Every structure is written in C-alpha cells, then in structure tokens.
Amino acid sequence: EGFKKLSKACHIDADKKITKKHLVEIGCNYIEFGLKNANTYDLMFGTAVGNFAEYPELLESANSTYENMRLSFSKLASDSDEVIAFKCITLWSMVHGLVGILRKVQVVGDDFDEGVGPISTASVIATNLEDHLDKVLTGLIQS
C-alpha cells in the first residue's frame, strides 16, 4: 500500500516531454510523502519486511518508483544507461536522506543555533526545497 501511494505521488508520464522541473516536483513529492507518512515510510524502508523477494508484488511496487525516476532522468541526461543508473541512485539517496534529516528539523523546530551544525543548514533547505533540488539535479545532469 505504501509503495503504491509513493509511486503514485512520484509518477511522471515518461512518454511525454520530461523537464528538470518535473524531477524537482517528484523529489518534493517523495520528501513530502516521507514527512507526512513517517510510520508507513519507516515500514517501507526499514527492516520489518526482510527479504522483498518473498513478496513479489511488494517488490514490483517498490521497484516501479525507482524505474520511473530512472527513465525520467534518462530523458534529461546524455549518459550511458550505467551512468544514468548511478546518477539516479545518487538522486534517490539524496531525497531519501533528506526525509530523515528534515524529520529532525521538524522535531527541533526553531530550537537550534543559526549557522551551527547540520540542522541549521537543513532548515534553510526545508524552506527552499525546490531550489535545493533544482541545484542538485543540475549538478547530476551536467556531471
């Protein structure tokens, strides 16, 4: 159920023209899903399921989000399939990591020293998420 909801929130019609803005939007949707559905997200990406191969429908659902992201990214980059796969994993790990970091920002709120430590920087990212993702995507596409 969780993977289906995430896949729906992050789906791009890869048959249409793909823009960087589309990928920024799905990155934001991914992060928003993780922040709003923390318990489900933790079950999806934690160790509760164990071996996904024992649950083929779950595995297929989990893979569909990545595959759609990879296919969409491939329309923007002129790299080999192998390089695109590596860049897509980098992108996915970044948005996945931001879910955890931004959850901490939500817990801490305004109770941190400005300019000190990762929470300060993460708070800036949280308020400028689209801009941050745009810069990251630009770097991945151009590298």
Language-model region placement:
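Hydrophobic alpha-helical connector segments
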Residues: K8-N39, S64, L91
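Generic structural signal for alpha-helix termini and adjacent loop/cap motifs
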Residues: K36-N37, T47, V105, S143
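Hydrophobic/aromatic-rich alpha-helical bundle segments in the mid-to-C-terminal region
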Residues: F52, P56-L59, S74-V136
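Short, flexible helix-adjacent loops and helix caps
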Residues: H11-D15, G46-V49, R103-V107
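Short secondary-structure transition hinges
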Residues: N39-N68, D113
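Charged/polar positions within long, soluble alpha-helices
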Residues: H11, L35, N39-D42, S74, ...
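Hydrophobic alpha-helical bundle segments that form small-molecule/ligand-binding pockets
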Residues: I12-K16, S64-L91, L140-S143
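Short, basic, alpha-helical segments at the C-terminal edge of helix-turn-helix-like DNA-binding modules
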Residues: E1-K4
